[in-house]
Amino acid sequence: MAAKLVSLDMQARTALIKGLDTVADTVKITLGPKGRNVVLEKKFGAPVITNDGVTIAKEIDLEDPFENMGAQLVKEVASKTNDVAGDGTTTATVLAQALVHEGMKHVVAGANPMYVKRGIEKAVEKVVEELKKIAKPVETKQDIAHVAAISANNDEEIGNLIAEAMDKVGKDGVITVEESQGITTTLELVEGMQFDRGYLSAYMITDPERMEAVLEEPYILITDKKISAVSEILPILERVVQTGKPLVIIAEDVEGEALATLVVNKLRGVLQSLAVKAPGFGDRRKAMLQDIAILTGGQFISEETGIKLENVTLDMLGRAEKVRANKDKTTIIGGKGNKKDIEARIAQIKKQLEETDSEFDREKLQERLAKLAGGVAVIKVGAATEVELKEKKHRIEDALSATKAAVEEGIVPGGGVALIRTIKALDDIKVDNEDERIGVEIVRRSLDVPLKLIANNAGKEGSIIAEKVKEMDGPMGYDAARDRFVNMFDAGIVDPCKVTRSALQNAASIAALVLTTEGLVAEKPEKEKQTPPPPPEY
Protein backbone atom coordinates (compact mmCIF):
# COMPACT_ATOMS: atom_id res chain seq x y z
CA MET A 1 0.00 0.00 0.00
CA ALA A 2 1.29 3.48 -0.95
CA ALA A 3 2.57 5.71 1.86
CA LYS A 4 0.48 8.76 2.85
CA LEU A 5 1.35 12.33 3.70
CA VAL A 6 -0.39 13.84 6.74
CA SER A 7 -0.74 17.52 7.59
CA LEU A 8 -2.42 18.93 10.73
CA ASP A 9 -3.70 22.16 12.33
CA MET A 10 -2.44 25.48 11.00
CA GLN A 11 -0.13 23.86 8.48
CA ALA A 12 -3.08 21.97 6.94
CA ARG A 13 -5.31 25.03 6.79
CA THR A 14 -2.56 27.20 5.29
CA ALA A 15 -2.01 24.69 2.47
CA LEU A 16 -5.76 24.44 1.79
CA ILE A 17 -6.11 28.22 1.63
CA LYS A 18 -3.07 28.57 -0.64
CA GLY A 19 -4.63 26.16 -3.15
CA LEU A 20 -8.01 27.83 -2.83
CA ASP A 21 -6.44 31.27 -3.44
CA THR A 22 -4.57 30.08 -6.54
CA VAL A 23 -7.84 29.11 -8.24
CA ALA A 24 -9.90 32.03 -6.88
CA ASP A 25 -7.27 34.64 -7.89
CA THR A 26 -7.20 33.26 -11.45
CA VAL A 27 -11.00 33.20 -11.69
CA LYS A 28 -11.81 36.55 -10.08
CA ILE A 29 -10.09 38.68 -12.74
CA THR A 30 -12.98 37.73 -15.06
CA LEU A 31 -15.76 39.21 -12.86
CA GLY A 32 -17.90 42.07 -14.15
CA PRO A 33 -18.35 43.85 -17.49
CA LYS A 34 -14.69 44.90 -17.53
CA GLY A 35 -13.31 41.56 -16.34
CA ARG A 36 -10.47 40.06 -18.37
CA ASN A 37 -10.22 36.75 -20.22
CA VAL A 38 -8.05 33.74 -19.36
CA VAL A 39 -6.35 31.64 -22.04
CA LEU A 40 -6.32 27.87 -21.44
CA GLU A 41 -3.75 25.67 -23.13
CA LYS A 42 -5.07 22.55 -24.86
CA LYS A 43 -2.91 19.52 -25.63
CA PHE A 44 -4.44 19.32 -29.09
CA GLY A 45 -5.65 22.22 -31.19
CA ALA A 46 -5.85 25.92 -30.49
CA PRO A 47 -5.95 27.32 -26.93
CA VAL A 48 -9.35 28.27 -25.48
CA ILE A 49 -10.11 31.87 -24.49
CA THR A 50 -12.80 32.21 -21.82
CA ASN A 51 -14.10 34.33 -18.97
CA ASP A 52 -16.27 31.55 -17.52
CA GLY A 53 -15.36 30.76 -13.90
CA VAL A 54 -16.12 27.05 -13.92
CA THR A 55 -14.23 26.40 -17.18
CA ILE A 56 -11.12 28.09 -15.77
CA ALA A 57 -11.37 26.37 -12.37
CA LYS A 58 -11.68 22.92 -13.94
CA GLU A 59 -8.39 23.40 -15.80
CA ILE A 60 -6.31 24.04 -12.65
CA ASP A 61 -4.44 21.21 -10.92
CA LEU A 62 -1.62 21.96 -8.49
CA GLU A 63 1.56 20.00 -7.84
CA ASP A 64 1.42 20.08 -4.03
CA PRO A 65 -1.21 17.48 -2.97
CA PHE A 66 -2.44 19.53 0.02
CA GLU A 67 -2.75 22.75 -1.96
CA ASN A 68 -4.47 20.78 -4.70
CA MET A 69 -7.16 19.75 -2.19
CA GLY A 70 -7.96 23.44 -1.66
CA ALA A 71 -8.08 23.95 -5.41
CA GLN A 72 -10.46 20.99 -5.82
CA LEU A 73 -12.80 22.40 -3.16
CA VAL A 74 -13.13 25.67 -5.09
CA LYS A 75 -13.76 23.69 -8.28
CA GLU A 76 -16.59 22.00 -6.41
CA VAL A 77 -18.12 25.41 -5.55
CA ALA A 78 -17.97 26.51 -9.18
CA SER A 79 -19.23 23.30 -10.74
CA LYS A 80 -22.06 22.85 -8.21
CA THR A 81 -23.26 26.40 -8.87
CA ASN A 82 -22.99 25.75 -12.60
CA ASP A 83 -25.03 22.54 -12.28
CA VAL A 84 -27.80 24.19 -10.28
CA ALA A 85 -28.04 27.60 -11.93
CA GLY A 86 -25.84 27.46 -15.04
CA ASP A 87 -24.04 30.70 -14.16
CA GLY A 88 -22.64 32.68 -11.21
CA THR A 89 -19.56 30.47 -10.92
CA THR A 90 -17.13 33.38 -10.58
CA THR A 91 -19.30 35.02 -7.90
CA ALA A 92 -19.46 31.72 -5.99
CA THR A 93 -15.67 31.32 -6.12
CA VAL A 94 -15.07 34.89 -4.95
CA LEU A 95 -17.56 34.54 -2.07
CA ALA A 96 -15.99 31.24 -0.96
CA GLN A 97 -12.56 32.89 -0.85
CA ALA A 98 -13.89 35.88 1.14
CA LEU A 99 -15.75 33.69 3.65
CA VAL A 100 -12.70 31.47 4.22
CA HIS A 101 -10.31 34.41 4.74
CA GLU A 102 -12.69 36.24 7.08
CA GLY A 103 -13.44 33.04 9.00
CA MET A 104 -9.83 31.93 9.31
CA LYS A 105 -8.85 35.11 11.18
CA HIS A 106 -11.35 34.23 13.92
CA VAL A 107 -10.60 30.50 14.02
CA VAL A 108 -6.88 31.24 14.46
CA ALA A 109 -7.79 33.71 17.22
CA GLY A 110 -9.54 30.90 19.09
CA ALA A 111 -13.19 30.91 17.93
CA ASN A 112 -14.88 27.49 17.90
CA PRO A 113 -15.16 26.50 14.19
CA MET A 114 -18.35 24.47 14.75
CA TYR A 115 -20.21 27.45 16.23
CA VAL A 116 -18.79 29.74 13.55
CA LYS A 117 -20.10 27.30 10.94
CA ARG A 118 -23.56 27.39 12.53
CA GLY A 119 -23.51 31.20 12.48
CA ILE A 120 -22.58 31.19 8.79
CA GLU A 121 -25.46 28.80 8.01
CA LYS A 122 -27.99 30.98 9.89
CA ALA A 123 -26.79 34.10 8.08
CA VAL A 124 -26.93 32.46 4.64
CA GLU A 125 -30.47 31.24 5.31
CA LYS A 126 -31.51 34.80 6.18
CA VAL A 127 -29.83 36.26 3.08
CA VAL A 128 -31.54 33.72 0.79
CA GLU A 129 -34.90 34.57 2.38
CA GLU A 130 -34.23 38.27 1.76
CA LEU A 131 -33.11 37.68 -1.85
CA LYS A 132 -36.42 35.96 -2.56
CA LYS A 133 -38.27 39.02 -1.21
CA ILE A 134 -36.23 41.37 -3.42
CA ALA A 135 -36.69 39.22 -6.56
CA LYS A 136 -39.25 40.25 -9.13
CA PRO A 137 -40.65 37.93 -11.80
CA VAL A 138 -39.38 38.00 -15.38
CA GLU A 139 -42.31 39.32 -17.35
CA THR A 140 -41.15 40.93 -20.56
CA LYS A 141 -39.04 39.91 -23.51
CA GLN A 142 -36.83 42.87 -22.56
CA ASP A 143 -36.14 41.37 -19.10
CA ILE A 144 -35.03 38.09 -20.69
CA ALA A 145 -32.78 39.96 -23.14
CA HIS A 146 -31.09 41.84 -20.24
CA VAL A 147 -30.43 38.67 -18.22
CA ALA A 148 -29.03 36.82 -21.25
CA ALA A 149 -26.86 39.76 -22.37
CA ILE A 150 -25.24 40.15 -18.93
CA SER A 151 -24.50 36.44 -18.66
CA ALA A 152 -22.99 36.50 -22.17
CA ASN A 153 -20.49 39.14 -21.04
CA ASN A 154 -22.70 42.12 -21.94
CA ASP A 155 -23.34 41.01 -25.52
CA GLU A 156 -26.69 42.53 -26.50
CA GLU A 157 -26.87 40.61 -29.78
CA ILE A 158 -26.83 37.30 -27.87
CA GLY A 159 -29.34 38.68 -25.35
CA ASN A 160 -31.83 39.60 -28.08
CA LEU A 161 -31.33 36.28 -29.85
CA ILE A 162 -32.15 34.26 -26.71
CA ALA A 163 -35.12 36.51 -25.88
CA GLU A 164 -36.42 35.95 -29.42
CA ALA A 165 -35.96 32.17 -29.11
CA MET A 166 -37.77 32.05 -25.74
CA ASP A 167 -40.55 34.21 -27.11
CA LYS A 168 -41.07 31.76 -29.97
CA VAL A 169 -40.95 28.41 -28.14
CA GLY A 170 -42.26 29.47 -24.73
CA LYS A 171 -40.77 28.81 -21.31
CA ASP A 172 -41.02 25.03 -21.64
CA GLY A 173 -39.61 24.95 -25.17
CA VAL A 174 -36.16 23.60 -25.92
CA ILE A 175 -33.45 25.91 -27.22
CA THR A 176 -30.38 24.13 -28.56
CA VAL A 177 -27.04 25.65 -29.51
CA GLU A 178 -25.18 24.34 -32.57
CA GLU A 179 -22.12 25.39 -34.53
CA SER A 180 -22.78 26.99 -37.90
CA GLN A 181 -20.61 26.93 -41.02
CA GLY A 182 -20.96 30.68 -41.66
CA ILE A 183 -19.75 33.69 -39.68
CA THR A 184 -23.17 35.00 -38.60
CA THR A 185 -25.20 33.73 -35.63
CA THR A 186 -28.79 32.92 -36.57
CA LEU A 187 -31.97 31.57 -35.01
CA GLU A 188 -33.92 28.72 -36.62
CA LEU A 189 -37.33 27.55 -35.51
CA VAL A 190 -38.76 24.06 -35.75
CA GLU A 191 -42.53 24.22 -35.42
CA GLY A 192 -44.57 21.24 -34.32
CA MET A 193 -43.13 17.90 -33.27
CA GLN A 194 -40.00 16.87 -35.12
CA PHE A 195 -38.07 13.61 -34.87
CA ASP A 196 -34.99 12.23 -36.61
CA ARG A 197 -36.55 9.71 -38.96
CA GLY A 198 -37.35 10.31 -42.63
CA TYR A 199 -39.47 8.61 -45.31
CA LEU A 200 -38.82 4.92 -45.98
CA SER A 201 -39.10 5.24 -49.76
CA ALA A 202 -38.22 8.11 -52.09
CA TYR A 203 -41.35 7.22 -54.12
CA MET A 204 -43.39 8.85 -51.35
CA ILE A 205 -42.06 12.33 -52.19
CA THR A 206 -44.73 14.88 -53.17
CA ASP A 207 -42.39 17.85 -53.75
CA PRO A 208 -39.52 16.65 -56.01
CA GLU A 209 -37.85 20.08 -56.02
CA ARG A 210 -37.31 20.07 -52.24
CA MET A 211 -37.19 16.26 -51.99
CA GLU A 212 -39.98 16.33 -49.40
CA ALA A 213 -43.21 14.49 -48.74
CA VAL A 214 -45.90 16.92 -47.55
CA LEU A 215 -49.31 15.51 -46.60
CA GLU A 216 -52.22 17.82 -45.75
CA GLU A 217 -54.83 16.78 -43.14
CA PRO A 218 -53.61 13.15 -42.98
CA TYR A 219 -54.72 10.27 -40.79
CA ILE A 220 -51.80 8.94 -38.68
CA LEU A 221 -51.33 5.29 -37.67
CA ILE A 222 -48.97 5.00 -34.66
CA THR A 223 -47.57 1.58 -33.76
CA ASP A 224 -44.41 -0.08 -32.42
CA LYS A 225 -44.89 -3.14 -34.65
CA LYS A 226 -42.88 -4.14 -37.69
CA ILE A 227 -45.27 -4.21 -40.68
CA SER A 228 -44.32 -6.53 -43.53
CA ALA A 229 -47.55 -8.33 -44.54
CA VAL A 230 -50.06 -6.19 -46.43
CA SER A 231 -52.94 -8.16 -44.90
CA GLU A 232 -52.22 -6.47 -41.54
CA ILE A 233 -52.93 -2.97 -42.83
CA LEU A 234 -55.36 -3.70 -45.69
CA PRO A 235 -58.56 -3.08 -43.62
CA ILE A 236 -57.39 0.36 -42.46
CA LEU A 237 -56.08 1.27 -45.94
CA GLU A 238 -59.53 0.60 -47.38
CA ARG A 239 -61.18 2.76 -44.71
CA VAL A 240 -58.77 5.67 -45.29
CA VAL A 241 -59.19 5.49 -49.10
CA GLN A 242 -62.93 6.05 -48.63
CA THR A 243 -62.26 9.33 -46.76
CA GLY A 244 -60.08 10.67 -49.57
CA LYS A 245 -57.42 11.77 -47.02
CA PRO A 246 -53.72 10.76 -47.02
CA LEU A 247 -52.26 8.26 -44.50
CA VAL A 248 -49.06 8.47 -42.44
CA ILE A 249 -47.74 5.28 -40.86
CA ILE A 250 -45.26 5.58 -37.98
CA ALA A 251 -44.04 2.06 -37.14
CA GLU A 252 -40.91 0.17 -36.06
CA ASP A 253 -40.47 -0.63 -39.75
CA VAL A 254 -42.55 -0.99 -42.91
CA GLU A 255 -41.02 -3.41 -45.38
CA GLY A 256 -41.63 -6.04 -48.06
CA GLU A 257 -45.07 -6.26 -49.64
CA ALA A 258 -46.59 -3.75 -47.20
CA LEU A 259 -44.18 -1.03 -48.35
CA ALA A 260 -44.55 -2.08 -52.00
CA THR A 261 -48.37 -1.82 -51.73
CA LEU A 262 -48.15 1.71 -50.30
CA VAL A 263 -45.76 2.80 -53.06
CA VAL A 264 -47.88 1.28 -55.88
CA ASN A 265 -51.07 2.90 -54.55
CA LYS A 266 -49.27 6.25 -54.28
CA LEU A 267 -47.98 6.02 -57.88
CA ARG A 268 -51.43 5.07 -59.17
CA GLY A 269 -53.02 7.94 -57.30
CA VAL A 270 -55.26 5.66 -55.22
CA LEU A 271 -53.88 6.65 -51.78
CA GLN A 272 -51.31 9.25 -50.87
CA SER A 273 -49.23 7.74 -48.08
CA LEU A 274 -46.04 8.17 -46.09
CA ALA A 275 -44.25 5.56 -44.00
CA VAL A 276 -41.58 6.52 -41.43
CA LYS A 277 -39.71 4.59 -38.76
CA ALA A 278 -40.57 5.25 -35.13
CA PRO A 279 -38.10 7.55 -33.29
CA GLY A 280 -35.90 6.46 -30.36
CA PHE A 281 -35.14 3.01 -28.97
CA GLY A 282 -36.61 0.64 -26.38
CA ASP A 283 -38.77 2.20 -23.67
CA ARG A 284 -37.96 5.70 -24.90
CA ARG A 285 -39.43 4.78 -28.30
CA LYS A 286 -42.71 3.68 -26.66
CA ALA A 287 -42.85 6.91 -24.64
CA MET A 288 -42.26 9.02 -27.77
CA LEU A 289 -44.91 7.14 -29.75
CA GLN A 290 -47.37 7.72 -26.91
CA ASP A 291 -46.45 11.43 -27.03
CA ILE A 292 -47.24 11.48 -30.77
CA ALA A 293 -50.53 9.64 -30.15
CA ILE A 294 -51.58 12.19 -27.50
CA LEU A 295 -50.47 15.14 -29.66
CA THR A 296 -52.50 13.90 -32.66
CA GLY A 297 -55.46 12.49 -30.72
CA GLY A 298 -54.86 8.92 -31.86
CA GLN A 299 -54.21 5.64 -30.07
CA PHE A 300 -50.84 3.96 -29.68
CA ILE A 301 -51.29 0.52 -31.30
CA SER A 302 -49.15 -2.05 -29.51
CA GLU A 303 -49.09 -5.70 -28.44
CA GLU A 304 -49.24 -4.39 -24.87
CA THR A 305 -52.53 -2.56 -25.45
CA GLY A 306 -54.00 -5.71 -27.00
CA ILE A 307 -55.08 -4.03 -30.26
CA LYS A 308 -54.23 -5.83 -33.50
CA LEU A 309 -53.46 -3.87 -36.65
CA GLU A 310 -56.24 -5.67 -38.54
CA ASN A 311 -58.80 -4.35 -36.03
CA VAL A 312 -57.77 -0.69 -36.16
CA THR A 313 -60.62 1.72 -36.89
CA LEU A 314 -60.51 5.31 -38.18
CA ASP A 315 -61.17 6.81 -34.73
CA MET A 316 -57.97 5.14 -33.44
CA LEU A 317 -55.87 7.13 -35.93
CA GLY A 318 -54.32 10.49 -35.10
CA ARG A 319 -54.96 13.67 -37.10
CA ALA A 320 -52.78 16.68 -37.89
CA GLU A 321 -52.94 19.76 -40.11
CA LYS A 322 -49.79 18.74 -41.96
CA VAL A 323 -46.99 16.17 -41.89
CA ARG A 324 -43.73 16.98 -43.63
CA ALA A 325 -40.87 14.50 -44.13
CA ASN A 326 -37.52 14.47 -45.91
CA LYS A 327 -34.95 11.68 -45.93
CA ASP A 328 -33.73 12.56 -42.40
CA LYS A 329 -36.56 14.22 -40.47
CA THR A 330 -40.33 14.12 -40.02
CA THR A 331 -42.35 17.03 -38.62
CA ILE A 332 -45.95 16.83 -37.42
CA ILE A 333 -47.55 20.29 -37.53
CA GLY A 334 -50.84 21.18 -35.84
CA GLY A 335 -51.62 17.91 -34.05
CA LYS A 336 -55.35 17.64 -33.32
CA GLY A 337 -55.11 16.01 -29.91
CA ASN A 338 -57.24 16.96 -26.92
CA LYS A 339 -55.71 19.99 -25.16
CA LYS A 340 -56.37 18.58 -21.68
CA ASP A 341 -54.68 15.28 -22.56
CA ILE A 342 -51.65 17.14 -23.90
CA GLU A 343 -51.45 19.28 -20.73
CA ALA A 344 -51.73 16.18 -18.54
CA ARG A 345 -48.89 14.54 -20.50
CA ILE A 346 -46.75 17.68 -20.12
CA ALA A 347 -47.39 17.67 -16.35
CA GLN A 348 -46.40 13.99 -16.19
CA ILE A 349 -43.10 14.63 -18.02
CA LYS A 350 -42.35 17.62 -15.73
CA LYS A 351 -42.84 15.34 -12.72
CA GLN A 352 -40.38 12.82 -14.21
CA LEU A 353 -37.94 15.69 -14.82
CA GLU A 354 -38.02 16.64 -11.13
CA GLU A 355 -37.39 13.06 -10.03
CA THR A 356 -34.58 12.01 -12.38
CA ASP A 357 -30.90 12.21 -11.38
CA SER A 358 -29.50 11.28 -14.79
CA GLU A 359 -28.29 14.18 -16.95
CA PHE A 360 -28.97 12.14 -20.12
CA ASP A 361 -32.55 11.32 -19.07
CA ARG A 362 -33.13 14.95 -18.13
CA GLU A 363 -32.02 16.09 -21.57
CA LYS A 364 -34.29 13.58 -23.33
CA LEU A 365 -37.29 14.43 -21.13
CA GLN A 366 -36.70 18.14 -21.78
CA GLU A 367 -36.73 17.42 -25.53
CA ARG A 368 -40.00 15.50 -25.27
CA LEU A 369 -41.49 18.29 -23.20
CA ALA A 370 -40.55 20.90 -25.78
CA LYS A 371 -41.97 18.89 -28.65
CA LEU A 372 -45.30 18.63 -26.87
CA ALA A 373 -45.30 22.18 -25.53
CA GLY A 374 -44.54 24.15 -28.63
CA GLY A 375 -41.39 23.44 -30.54
CA VAL A 376 -37.65 23.71 -30.65
CA ALA A 377 -35.45 26.72 -31.42
CA VAL A 378 -31.91 26.21 -32.70
CA ILE A 379 -29.30 28.95 -32.28
CA LYS A 380 -26.63 28.44 -34.95
CA VAL A 381 -23.42 30.08 -33.75
CA GLY A 382 -21.14 31.57 -36.39
CA ALA A 383 -17.67 33.12 -36.04
CA ALA A 384 -14.59 33.92 -38.12
CA THR A 385 -12.22 31.48 -36.37
CA GLU A 386 -12.64 28.23 -34.44
CA VAL A 387 -11.29 29.80 -31.23
CA GLU A 388 -13.87 32.59 -31.42
CA LEU A 389 -16.62 30.09 -32.30
CA LYS A 390 -15.95 27.97 -29.20
CA GLU A 391 -15.79 31.04 -26.94
CA LYS A 392 -19.03 32.47 -28.37
CA LYS A 393 -20.84 29.13 -28.15
CA HIS A 394 -19.79 28.86 -24.51
CA ARG A 395 -21.15 32.34 -23.74
CA ILE A 396 -24.48 31.54 -25.41
CA GLU A 397 -24.83 28.30 -23.43
CA ASP A 398 -24.12 30.24 -20.20
CA ALA A 399 -26.63 32.92 -21.11
CA LEU A 400 -29.25 30.29 -21.89
CA SER A 401 -28.81 28.65 -18.47
CA ALA A 402 -28.99 32.01 -16.70
CA THR A 403 -32.16 32.93 -18.57
CA LYS A 404 -33.87 29.68 -17.59
CA ALA A 405 -32.86 30.31 -13.97
CA ALA A 406 -34.33 33.83 -14.18
CA VAL A 407 -37.65 32.50 -15.47
CA GLU A 408 -37.77 30.02 -12.56
CA GLU A 409 -37.10 32.30 -9.56
CA GLY A 410 -37.17 35.85 -10.90
CA ILE A 411 -34.47 38.53 -11.08
CA VAL A 412 -32.64 40.70 -8.54
CA PRO A 413 -30.52 43.85 -9.06
CA GLY A 414 -27.19 42.81 -10.59
CA GLY A 415 -23.62 43.98 -10.09
CA GLY A 416 -23.44 42.62 -6.53
CA VAL A 417 -26.16 45.04 -5.33
CA ALA A 418 -28.70 42.37 -4.30
CA LEU A 419 -26.24 40.85 -1.79
CA ILE A 420 -25.51 44.28 -0.28
CA ARG A 421 -29.26 44.96 0.14
CA THR A 422 -29.58 41.84 2.30
CA ILE A 423 -26.96 42.98 4.84
CA LYS A 424 -29.47 44.86 7.05
CA ALA A 425 -31.57 41.70 7.46
CA LEU A 426 -28.66 40.08 9.34
CA ASP A 427 -29.32 42.41 12.32
CA ASP A 428 -32.43 40.38 13.21
CA ILE A 429 -30.70 37.01 13.56
CA LYS A 430 -30.86 35.40 17.00
CA VAL A 431 -27.60 33.65 17.94
CA ASP A 432 -26.87 31.30 20.84
CA ASN A 433 -23.33 32.50 21.64
CA GLU A 434 -20.50 34.83 20.66
CA ASP A 435 -18.92 32.42 18.15
CA GLU A 436 -22.20 32.09 16.24
CA ARG A 437 -22.36 35.89 16.08
CA ILE A 438 -18.85 35.81 14.58
CA GLY A 439 -20.21 33.45 11.88
CA VAL A 440 -22.95 35.98 11.04
CA GLU A 441 -20.36 38.81 10.93
CA ILE A 442 -18.18 36.78 8.54
CA VAL A 443 -21.08 36.57 6.08
CA ARG A 444 -21.89 40.28 6.59
CA ARG A 445 -18.31 41.28 5.67
CA SER A 446 -18.21 38.98 2.64
CA LEU A 447 -21.43 40.14 0.97
CA ASP A 448 -19.90 43.29 -0.55
CA VAL A 449 -16.87 41.47 -2.03
CA PRO A 450 -18.41 40.77 -5.49
CA LEU A 451 -19.28 44.48 -5.93
CA LYS A 452 -15.79 45.57 -4.81
CA LEU A 453 -14.22 43.19 -7.32
CA ILE A 454 -16.45 44.35 -10.19
CA ALA A 455 -15.34 47.93 -9.43
CA ASN A 456 -11.66 46.93 -9.06
CA ASN A 457 -11.74 45.14 -12.42
CA ALA A 458 -13.19 48.33 -13.94
CA GLY A 459 -10.19 50.28 -12.63
CA LYS A 460 -11.98 51.92 -9.67
CA GLU A 461 -11.45 51.74 -5.91
CA GLY A 462 -13.82 48.95 -4.87
CA SER A 463 -14.17 49.97 -1.20
CA ILE A 464 -15.25 53.53 -2.05
CA ILE A 465 -17.82 52.33 -4.62
CA ALA A 466 -19.18 49.74 -2.16
CA GLU A 467 -19.66 52.38 0.58
CA LYS A 468 -21.52 54.68 -1.83
CA VAL A 469 -23.85 51.84 -2.88
CA LYS A 470 -24.52 50.95 0.78
CA GLU A 471 -25.70 54.54 1.36
CA MET A 472 -28.25 54.17 -1.47
CA ASP A 473 -31.53 52.28 -1.34
CA GLY A 474 -33.39 49.58 -3.26
CA PRO A 475 -32.13 48.70 -6.73
CA MET A 476 -29.69 51.66 -6.95
CA GLY A 477 -26.16 50.47 -7.73
CA TYR A 478 -22.97 50.90 -9.74
CA ASP A 479 -22.92 50.38 -13.52
CA ALA A 480 -19.27 49.40 -14.07
CA ALA A 481 -19.60 49.28 -17.87
CA ARG A 482 -20.50 53.00 -18.07
CA ASP A 483 -19.02 54.17 -14.73
CA ARG A 484 -22.21 55.62 -13.20
CA PHE A 485 -24.72 55.00 -10.42
CA VAL A 486 -28.11 53.90 -11.71
CA ASN A 487 -31.32 52.04 -10.91
CA MET A 488 -30.14 48.51 -11.80
CA PHE A 489 -33.59 47.30 -12.90
CA ASP A 490 -34.09 50.31 -15.22
CA ALA A 491 -30.58 49.93 -16.67
CA GLY A 492 -31.19 46.22 -17.32
CA ILE A 493 -28.35 45.17 -14.98
CA VAL A 494 -30.00 42.16 -13.38
CA ASP A 495 -29.05 38.69 -12.17
CA PRO A 496 -31.29 35.65 -11.81
CA CYS A 497 -32.19 35.20 -8.12
CA LYS A 498 -31.39 31.48 -8.46
CA VAL A 499 -27.83 32.27 -9.60
CA THR A 500 -27.10 34.69 -6.74
CA ARG A 501 -28.71 32.37 -4.18
CA SER A 502 -26.84 29.25 -5.40
CA ALA A 503 -23.52 31.11 -5.53
CA LEU A 504 -23.81 32.12 -1.86
CA GLN A 505 -25.14 28.76 -0.63
CA ASN A 506 -22.39 26.74 -2.33
CA ALA A 507 -19.66 29.18 -1.29
CA ALA A 508 -20.80 29.03 2.35
CA SER A 509 -20.99 25.24 2.27
CA ILE A 510 -17.35 24.86 1.18
CA ALA A 511 -16.11 27.71 3.40
CA ALA A 512 -17.66 26.03 6.46
CA LEU A 513 -15.90 22.78 5.55
CA VAL A 514 -12.52 24.50 5.22
CA LEU A 515 -12.93 26.32 8.55
CA THR A 516 -13.74 23.09 10.39
CA THR A 517 -10.81 21.17 8.86
CA GLU A 518 -7.97 20.16 11.20
CA GLY A 519 -6.12 17.53 9.18
CA LEU A 520 -5.29 16.50 5.60
CA VAL A 521 -4.22 13.10 4.27
CA ALA A 522 -2.83 12.69 0.75
CA GLU A 523 -1.04 10.12 -1.38
CA LYS A 524 2.74 10.40 -1.20
CA PRO A 525 3.97 10.98 -4.75
CA GLU A 526 6.14 8.08 -5.91
CA LYS A 527 9.62 8.87 -7.10
CA GLU A 528 9.99 8.03 -10.74
CA LYS A 529 12.07 4.92 -11.16
CA GLN A 530 15.03 5.44 -13.41
CA THR A 531 14.87 3.28 -16.47
CA PRO A 532 17.88 0.94 -16.71
CA PRO A 533 20.31 1.66 -19.54
CA PRO A 534 19.85 -0.48 -22.66
CA PRO A 535 22.11 -3.56 -22.89
CA PRO A 536 25.33 -3.01 -24.83
CA GLU A 537 25.31 -4.06 -28.47
CA TYR A 538 27.86 -6.69 -29.53
Curated annotation (Swiss-Prot):
A single Gene Ontology MF term assigned here is: unfolded protein binding
The record's subcellular location field reads: Cytoplasm
Family annotation (InterPro entries): Chaperonin_Cpn60_CS, Cpn60/GroEL, Cpn60/GroEL/TCP-1, GroEL-like_apical_dom_sf, GROEL-like_equatorial_sf, TCP-1-like_intermed_sf
Q: Which Enzyme Commission numbers does its entry carry? A: 5.6.1.7
Task: Give me the residues that bind ATP, please.
Answer: 30-33, 87-91, 415, 479-481, 495
Instruction: Give the residues annotated as coiled coil.
Output: none
Q: Which GO terms describe its biological process?
A: chaperone cofactor-dependent protein refolding; protein refolding; response to heat
Q: What class of enzyme is it?
A: isomerase
Q: Which HAMAP family match?
A: CH60
Similarity annotation: Belongs to the chaperonin (HSP60) family.
General function of this protein = Together with its co-chaperonin GroES, plays an essential role in assisting protein folding. The GroEL-GroES system forms a nano-cage that allows encapsulation of the non-native substrate proteins and provides a physical environment optimized to promote and accelerate protein folding.
NCBIfam families from the xrefs? GroEL, PRK00013.1, PRK12849.1, PRK12850.1, PRK12851.1
Subunit structure, interactors included: Forms a cylinder of 14 subunits composed of two heptameric rings stacked back-to-back. Interacts with the co-chaperonin GroES.
Q: What is this protein called?
A: Chaperonin GroEL
